């Protein structure tokens, strides 16, 4: 499933991580800098990502304008261990270069259509408390999501 906007310069596609990583690493660095005030370092586990992608678990949706990568949305598809036979998706990373208004909404809609197509029953979206994504909770609610939990991070 691909999305080509009425304006042909915007494309949304599921891409292979290995095919977009060299270009995407710059965006991931920008995302980490924007949303990680706790000192979490940029050091992706590329081999685990590739393994999960080969298993059909990890997916990356890439937004491009005139061929240039401007954003990505990633998720992991899995089974709900507490509800037999229930396929779920957990959003992992989502980043869009500043100034590309409306593209994030198109990315969300693309992902939701994909989830429906592959039989996902529940999607777990999240947002950080830092950076531009800190207001995504209201956006998710406008799209029909309900807040169900809050995550906490601690170093042992």
Predicted regions and their residues:
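Conserved catalytic-core motifs of GNAT/GCN5-like acyltransferases
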Residues: 126-127, 146-156
């Amino acid at each position: 499933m691909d999305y080509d906007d009425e304006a042909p310069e915007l494309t949304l596609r599921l891409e292979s991580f290995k095919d977009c990583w060299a270009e995407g690493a710059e965006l991931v660095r920008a995302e980490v800098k924007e949303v990680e005030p706790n000192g979490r370092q940029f050091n992706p586990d590329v081999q685990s990502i590739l393994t999960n992608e080969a298993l059909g678990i990890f997916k990356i949706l890439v937004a491009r304008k005139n061929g240039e990568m401007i954003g990505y949305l990633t998720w992991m598809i899995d089974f709900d261990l507490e509800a037999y036979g229930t396929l779920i998706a957990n959003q992992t990373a989502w980043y869009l270069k500043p100034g590309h208004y409306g593209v994030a909404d198109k990315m969300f809609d693309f992902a939701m259509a994909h989830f429906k197509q592959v039989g996902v029953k529940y999607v777990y979206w999240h947002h950080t408390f830092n950076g531009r994504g800190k207001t995504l909770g209201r956006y998710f609610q406008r799209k029909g999501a309900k807040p169900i939990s809050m995550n906490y991070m601690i170093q042992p």
